[in-house]
Amino acid sequence: MSSLPALDQFFTLYHQAYSDKLGESPRYFPLGEASPCVLECDQEKVDASPERSVQWQAVKRDSQGPFDNIEHALSITLHPSIQAFYGRYFAAPLMFESEFGEGELLQPWNQQDFEYLQQNLIGHLMMKQKLKQPATWFIGVLGEGDEMLVVENETGSVWIEIPGEQPHRQLAASLEDFIASLRPRVCPPQKPVEAPMPETDHPGIWQRLKTMWRHLIAKR
């Protein structure tokens, strides 16, 4: 059992919900990106038919993905719930319903995504420091993506944050409590559409978030 048991339980409920309603595992468009999550029956589709969706199953890593590179680069200690949330599994994004709306939780699809995620976490925190705002770590989005779901590093509480602004609404006292309040949302996979983005030397928070979603959901 990990230090974030609600996440373990949510994965169990998530896959069960898809099995009960659709008779199969959740689907995702990997766009040619390999992952240990892809079910064996769909492995050939990843390369042979990259435009097709595949069934996936969350895979727990043998050991938790390390975050010491982030802590060293930023001279900061990450809240342990962040490490448990991002470092324990490879999975596709998780769709959810809740009393505060629908949304998605971000998860790394493979090791390359995990490493890219770390780069974006560093960029997000550097921008927070530039704005002289408390450190937060993004974990997903609400609705159409105009609002981020973030964990406050000092307390571990979960908030809604609009990019460039301070968190403005607390949703839960901990990431454990937050995930425990969610319900799996069964829905067909949506094929990502990449929108062109202008290149900038110092992209803002929202641009960084868009880049993150482009790489981790839309794929390169």
UniProtKB/Swiss-Prot annotation:
It is found in: Cell inner membrane. GO terms for cellular component: cytoplasmic side of plasma membrane. Keywords: Cell inner membrane, Cell membrane, Membrane. NCBIfam families: PRK04968.1 (NF003439). InterPro entries: Syd (IPR009948), Syd_sf (IPR038228). It comes from the Bacteria. Interacts with the SecY protein in vivo. May bind preferentially to an uncomplexed state of SecY, thus functioning either as a chelating agent for excess SecY in the cell or as a regulatory factor that negatively controls the translocase function. Belongs to the Syd family. It is a peripheral membrane protein. Disulfide bonds: none annotated. Pfam families: Syd. This is Protein Syd. It comes from Shewanella loihica (strain ATCC BAA-1088 / PV-4).
